[in-house]
UniProtKB/Swiss-Prot annotation:
InterPro entries: DEAD/DEAH_box_helicase_dom, DEAD_box_RNA_helicase, Helicase_ATP-bd, Helicase_C-like, P-loop_NTPase, RNA-helicase_DEAD-box_CS, RNA_helicase_DEAD_Q_motif. A motif (Q motif) lies at residues 96-124. This is ATP-dependent RNA helicase dbp8. ATP-binding RNA helicase involved in 40S ribosomal subunit biogenesis and is required for the normal formation of 18S rRNAs through pre-rRNA processing at A0, A1 and A2 sites. Required for vegetative growth. The lineage of its organism: Eukaryota, Fungi, Dikarya, Ascomycota, Pezizomycotina. Belongs to the DEAD box helicase family. DDX49/DBP8 subfamily. The gene is dbp8.
């Protein structure tokens, strides 16, 4: 049986005069066609070709490029803002009122490129007053935008009269200093601003050269800047005598007295700067202490305006975001590590970026090694690590290469890592204010977060003091279908965690790093 010949496509240019059902092939052309072309007329012998109708996709593209096409929708959250459009968008958008705060147009545009278009309460309150030249005490909970509240007016006043070292920012930790340094660099990108970072853990010589080069803004930890003032020579630090603006970020920690106080170093730094009557002083903190308030009562020159004080108060005394869920988990003293392992492994927490806070560096070191052996993606941040390793570990956590950061209170202040959705207090902090700063690493800028505190029999009074400080009681931790005690028994986690802990302790005793490599005890002589 002969199979039927498949039908060939027929040109759309059809004439009624053509013969009924029979179609003849066209006469041979000088250019041999790759495929047999059919024609409806026997006398159609030329090589003319009728193009097929455009494909729908092509026609849609054509319509987009047509002159009468509608203009593209303005860039939203899903569309990146181009630098050339940022200024126009920032000044035009009603939702953004930075322009209404008398912020310079170039700064409005720079903030818009960073997706910062609407000022927060602390920014609305402080920016206009700082631009007027007033000293300022700004109190607002963590994650409320205090860095922008002092950076924007500082950069605007510097741009009006750029010279030498215009501003100094003091902050208690190296990681927070690095974060402020990077944020100021980003905001000042349209201008030729020269910030410099002065922190411990790195060589002093390049820092001394940078200070002698008269940078525009110095971001420093008090201890290292005090070392330069004492030992680097007059030529290095003489530029500090013309500073116009000084910022104490996390001022409660900088001005606190007692063991480990930074106050002597802060006083050394301030002694190298102009007197308070000749400079502008800004204090920002999440917890306004009596030492911070004391700035308001300092003697002032007659021509200087009074200190501006603002405490942005919301519910829960303005310390804990309403989007933060606070819980506690009762744990026996001998099985705290096993409870932590199971808590991090539940269905609800297994994928959450988390920070685990400890009271001691040795505890943080041990937990990192133990959790690594239990197949958690973990890194650490504490003072036993060299500065280069601290920076690298923090970068890994920011980039989600590690899901868990085990840290001491060195990471509790100021660090802004928006992805963090879980904070675990492995050790209950002794000071309720430290608890406020720890849990402030999550639920930032309106996002949701959870804080879980592991509570033993000896920690009850500490928890009660924390609840009184924040004005809210903790709830007992629970997850649907999950029993921590049941999983410990059923899965054999107690034995697994015990073995991992013993291996970690042996590794520490042998002087190995977290990857099991033998540490080189020879130190470089500087």
């Amino acid at each position: 049986m002969t199979s039927p010949v498949p039908s060939e496509p027929v040109s759309e240019d059809t004439h009624d005069s053509s013969s009924g059902s029979e179609v003849e092939p066209s006469k041979t052309s000088t250019r041999a066609p790759k495929r047999r072309r059919l024609s409806e007329s026997s006398d159609d012998s030329d090589d003319s070709y009728v193009a097929p109708a455009p494909l729908p996709t092509l026609s849609r593209i054509k319509k987009k490029g047509a002159p009468d096409a509608k203009p593209a929708a303005p860039a939203g959250q899903d569309n990146p803002v181009l630098i050339r459009d940022a200024l126009e968008i920032g000044l035009r958008e009603e939702a953004s009122s930075f322009a209404a705060l008398n912020v310079a147009p170039w700064l409005v545009g720079s903030l818009t490129t960073m997706a910062v278009r609407k000022p927060t309460a602390i920014q609305k309150a402080c920016i206009p007053e700082i631009l007027k030249g007033r000293d300022c005490i700004g109190g607002s909970r963590t994650g409320s935008g205090k860095t922008i509240a002092f950076s924007v007016p500082m950069l605007q006043k510097w741009a009006e009269d750029p010279f030498g070292i215009f501003g100094v920012v003091l902050t208690p930790t190296r990681e927070l200093a690095l974060q402020i340094f990077e944020q100021i660099k980003a905001i000042s990108a349209p201008q030729s601003m020269k910030p410099v970072l002065i922190t411990g853990g790195t060589d002093m010589r390049p820092q001394a050269i940078a200070l002698a080069g008269r940078p525009h803004v110095v971001i420093a930890t008090p201890g290292r800047l005090a070392d330069h003032i004492k030992s680097s020579g007059e030529d290095t630090v003489c530029g500090l005598k013309r500073v116009r603006m000084v910022v104490l970020d996390e001022a409660d920690r900088l001005l606190a007295s007692g063991p480990g106080s930074m106050l002597p170093d802060v006083e050394t730094c301030l002694s190298a700067l102009p007197p308070s009557s000749e400079r502008q002083t800004l204090l920002f903190t999440a917890t306004v202490t009596p030492e911070v308030r004391a700035l308001k009562n300092m003697p002032r020159s007659a021509n200087k305006p009074p200190v501006f004080v603002t405490e942005i108060s919301t519910e829960n005394q303005g310390t804990i975001p309403p989007t933060l869920k606070q819980t506690y988990l009762k744990v026996p003293l001998t099985h705290r590590e096993a409870f932590l392992h199971v808590l991090l492994s539940t269905e609800g927490n297994a994928s959450k970026p988390a920070i685990v806070f400890c009271n001691h560096t040795k505890t943080a070191d041990l937990l990192e090694r133990m959790l690594r052996r239990l197949s958690h993606r973990v890194t650490s941040l504490h003072s036993l690590l060299p500065q280069s390793e601290r920076n690298a570990n923090l970068a890994r956590f920011r980039a989600s290469a590690a899901r868990i950061l085990v840290a001491t209170d060195v990471a509790s202040r100021g660090l802004d890592i928006p992805t963090v959705s879980l904070v675990i207090n492995y050790d209950v902090p002794r000071n309720p204010d430290d608890y406020v700063h720890r849990v402030g690493r999550t639920a930032r800028a309106g996002r949701r977060g959870e804080a879980v505190t592991l509570v033993g029999q000896r920690d009850v009074q500490l928890v009660l003091a924390i609840e009184e400080r924040v004005g809210r009681q903790m709830e007992e931790w629970s997850e649907e279908g999950v029993s921590i005690e049941g999983r410990l028994v059923r899965t054999g986690a107690l034995k697994e965690v015990g073995e991992a802990k013993r291996e970690a302790m042996v590794e520490i005793d042998e002087g190995r790093d977290v990857l099991g490599r033998k540490r080189n005890k020879l130190k470089k002589v500087r």
